[in-house]
Amino acid sequence: LTKAQKIAGCVLANIGAETISIATFENNIPISLEIMPIGSTDITNDIALGLKISLDEAEQIKMGAITSYVYPKKKLEEIIDARLSDIFELIEAHLKKIGRNELLPAGIIITGGGSNISAIEESAKTSLKIPSKIGEISFGGIIHPELKNSVYTVAYGLCIFGFSQENDESLGVKITSITKNNIINWFKQFLP
């Protein structure tokens, strides 16, 4: 997140496989944290059940991969839209609970593996009635395109947190620029 987003007010939603973690910011301060027991695996399961296909095929279809399986596109859209609607209803309920629904000028920033689902950005915007965007990793320098994928945002965020705590002896974290390069090289080994 940018400082401007956190000052204006935004919600960061990390959509993982099993859970969704959200952090709401205003005036550069996190005002609410919530973890919800729903994730992108639920969408995969819905696709598998709805189209009567294997979980592997459902996952590939969910992520937009071209498969040999022929399926009705309209039915797939309905399945995905229904579960995304459930997800954003939960987020909306939380924002109502804290009095911030439709009141976050910087909107929702979506990260995590679930952020790669097609139409998620538009679904969030329509459901929450706030701006919506997919979070992007920015290293301030050259970074391999695969590492910009929002799947890596949590790992990336933890690394940045470690870097920012470099001089904090109470956490016992000492990260040098050599370690920073080692982390980048470690990420690169997972790239195709």
What is each stretch, according to the model?
Residues L1-I15, S21-P192:
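Helical "lid/coupling" subdomains associated with nucleotide-phosphate turnover
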